[in-house]
Design a protein with these regions (language model features):
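Glycine-rich oxoanion-binding loops at beta->alpha junctions
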Residues: 1-15
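A short, small-residue-rich loop immediately preceding and capping a beta-strand
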Residues: 12-23, 41
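Flexible, glycine/charged-enriched surface loops at secondary-structure junctions
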Residues: 13-14, 100-112, 140-160, 248-254
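Short glycine/serine/threonine-rich phosphate/pyrophosphate-binding segments
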Residues: 20-31, 49-52
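Short, acidic/small-residue loops that bind anionic groups at enzyme active sites
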Residues: 35-55
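Oxyanion-binding "anion nests"
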Residues: 132-183
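C-terminal non-catalytic interaction/assembly regions of soluble proteins
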Residues: 166-285
Length: 285
């Protein structure tokens, strides 16, 4: 699909590639592509995290077109799309992905070096590598590892708990859900709910919202700190809920309109993570 887009653009050799989001398998595929094609991977992405829609990128905020876009499936079907807006790119790609069996590979947001410099979130590949090094280190005690991780990501630990219930539904090609955790250790007696649409969007502790999109809500294993994705949530799983601030590009008016809580249907005005922590939360989702 990468080569198909290159031919469509009339470019003999693409100068490099980059991940569209720093989350899940989508952060790794560009590394494989770069290695197989013998080209550099640029140390940036378009989200600084993961979001459920293709238009939810800082490139979109900067007016960069997401198309031409190439899309393929495991059967070998390949399509090229040129759309009138990034919103239409998301709609058409979502429909095609559903028809392809709910899984597809895409090559998207062809961009110049200047566009990457102006609109990308820089250093995200390097940061991801450093996070992985901390999590996988065997010479650190659990408390030291957590402290080092939180310092690296400028994050907070929100909650320690055991997964008690997960409600899921698939709608419009998205995985919606609500996870309920029962507090452990210092959080014993408290309850946390996490609402997600592919990615975690809202964290609520004892009825008060304590973190909201576009700030990041990350669930990790209580002991190993290995990431726990929404797909891997199951009863009995012991989890730490961490949070870290989003990139400043998302805190603009256009950024909040694109990925803030109201876009996802929550009756909340965005309050930054650390400001919300000082206030002690925001009542009701």
């Amino acid at each position: 699909v990468f080569q198909k887009l290159s031919r469509y653009l009339g470019i003999e050799e693409i100068a490099g590639t980059f991940p569209m989001e720093a989350g899940g398998v989508n952060s790794m595929i560009p590394i494989v592509v770069a290695a197989s094609q013998g080209i550099p991977i640029v140390d940036c992405d378009g989200m600084g995290r993961a979001f459920p829609e293709l238009r939810m990128t800082t490139f979109n905020l900067g007016g960069v077109s997401s198309t031409p876009m190439a899309i393929t499936d495991e059967k070998g079907n390949i399509g090229i799309s040129e759309t009138i807006s990034n919103k239409w790119t998301e709609r058409l790609a979502r429909v095609q992905t559903v028809e392809m069996g709910a899984s597809s590979l895409i090559s998207i947001y062809p961009a110049t070096g200047r566009q990457l410099k102006d609109h990308g979130i820089h250093g995200i590949v390097t940061l991801s590598e450093k996070i992985g090094e901390v999590i996988r280190s065997n010479d650190l005690e659990e408390a030291t590892k957590l402290e080092k991780l939180l310092k690296l990501i400028d994050g907070l630990e929100l909650f320690q708990g055991k997964m008690m219930d997960v409600i899921r539904k698939v709608e419009g090609g998205f995985n919606f859900g609500e996870a309920t955790l029962e507090g452990l250790n210092q959080d014993a007696g408290s309850t946390m709910k996490i609402y997600f649409q592919n990615e975690n969007l809202i964290a609520e502790k004892d009825g008060s919202v304590i973190t909201m999109t576009p700030d990041l809500i990350c669930m990790v294993d209580l002991e190993t700190l290995m990431p726990v994705t929404t797909e891997a949530l199951k009863y009995g799983k012991r989890i730490r809920v961490l949070a870290l601030p989003c990139h400043e590009k998302w805190q603009t008016k256009e950024g909040i309109n694109t990925v803030g809580p109201r876009y996802f249907g929550y009756d909340l005005d965005y309050i930054p993570l650390k400001e919300l922590a000082i206030k002690g939360g925001h009542k009701h989702v």
